[in-house]
């Protein structure tokens, strides 16, 4: 059952949606979440942000919770029926209960996207710095499962070297969604 408090607005490559993405970039900077979202240092400007998010194969969404802009997510590195998910919740929505409800609702919604061949995704993957326990533990609280640690799995631009990454995965089964 879908949570009616969640609305996910797909962000395509139109002028209006580019302006929404510019506003999101500005908010990430003002809320100081840009560097922890792009810990690898690849995004240093608005244009780099737009190029990354609007890259072919990326599925970006503006997240609304109870009618208010609550965050932003995108899915990329789509292979078969798997994709990597990335999430940013705006500060107004930080807090254990709200954030967990939103995260679980997003996982449920994306894992029930369908086309003529059935479900688009069977698994969503997430990889974060192991030291960012807040991020990967949130995914676990939202229904993901811990797969394990990948040695030197991410590049940490702040330290200028590779660091261990935590890999998590969420499926319809881990969320208890009947098929």
Predicted regions and their residues:
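Conserved GNAT-fold acetyl-CoA-binding loop/helix
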Residues: 30-48
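Conserved beta-strand in the GNAT
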Residues: 62, 67-77, 84-86
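Conserved acetyl-CoA binding element of GNAT-fold acetyltransferases
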Residues: 76, 80-93, 127
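Conserved acetyl-CoA-binding loop-helix of GNAT-fold acetyltransferases
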Residues: 96-112, 137
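Conserved catalytic-core motifs of GNAT/GCN5-like acyltransferases
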Residues: 127, 145-162
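Conserved N-terminal entry element of GNAT/NAT acetyltransferase domains
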Residues: 1-19, 174-179
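Conserved beta-strand-loop-alpha-helix junction that forms the acyl-donor binding cleft
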Residues: 120-140, 153-154
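A short helix-loop-beta-strand connector motif used in the catalytic cores of GNAT acetyltransferases and
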Residues: 48-62, 71
